[in-house]
A protein has these predicted regions:
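Enzyme catalytic cores with a strong preference for nitrogen-chemistry domains
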Residues: 1-204
Length: 204
């Protein structure tokens, strides 16, 4: 377990009533004690301002935002990208309403273009609907404005795609208007990824 990223934007409009049960988490990263069975436990990085950097692949830096965060006027992913994140991941529970899938696709694609990043969006799906909300499992992988992979709704489909991290880093370097300007402190958390020869599904 590398870190815990809390939800900071709690919707309380339309069909959402999350403020009845939850309060927003903190952005600033800190160490929190997470107990385990018996007397064991460990300190875990907790907060939204966490940047997970790969030791073996320079340029691969991952940050997370949760669900509603990508829909707000100033998403956390903006700060993540300016702090150096090249891949944004989002665990979401976005319900299905008329036309919302098209809006969702446009939103994720647009955010990946604006931030010159890869954006991996995983949505609630099979077995998670209730009498109040229906979740279609609409998953999306986007890169710099291009939808690389997208699941069909109401299926248990696994999607995958290759993200060209070197291209993203190069594109950011080329754009004189894309400057890293971190307004709040981030905690870097290193992780390891084994390099393996992989057959690609796209030209990179």
């Amino acid at each position: 377990l590398l870190g815990l990223v809390p939800k900071v934007h709690i919707p309380n409009y339309g069909e959402f009533y999350e403020l009845r049960h939850f309060t927003p988490g903190n952005a600033e990263a800190e160490d929190v004690w997470v107990p385990e069975e018996g007397e064991d436990g460990d300190y875990i990085n907790f907060g939204t301002n966490l940047l997970f950097t790969c030791e073996e692949l320079p340029g691969l830096a991952v940050a997370a935002e949760i669900c509603e965060a990508v829909w707000v006027p100033n998403p956390p992913s903006i700060g993540h990208a300016l702090a150096g994140a090249t891949v944004i991941v989002n665990c979401s529970a976005s319900d299905e309403t008329t036309g919302k899938n098209l809006y969702r696709e446009s939103l994720i694609g647009g955010q990946s273009a604006r931030l010159v990043c890869g954006y991996i969006y995983a949505n609630a799906g099979e077995g998670e609907s209730s009498q109040d909300l229906v979740f279609g499992g609409h998953n999306i992988i986007a890169e710099n404005g291009t939808i690389l992979a997208e699941s069909a709704r109401f299926t248990s489909e696994t999607i995958y795609a290759e993200l060209d991290i070197a291209r993203l880093v190069g594109e950011r370097r080329r754009m004189t208007t894309f400057q890293t300007n971190v307004s709040s402190p981030y905690m870097e958390v290193g992780f390891h990824l084994k390099k393996e020869e992989t057959e690609l599904s796209r030209y990179v």
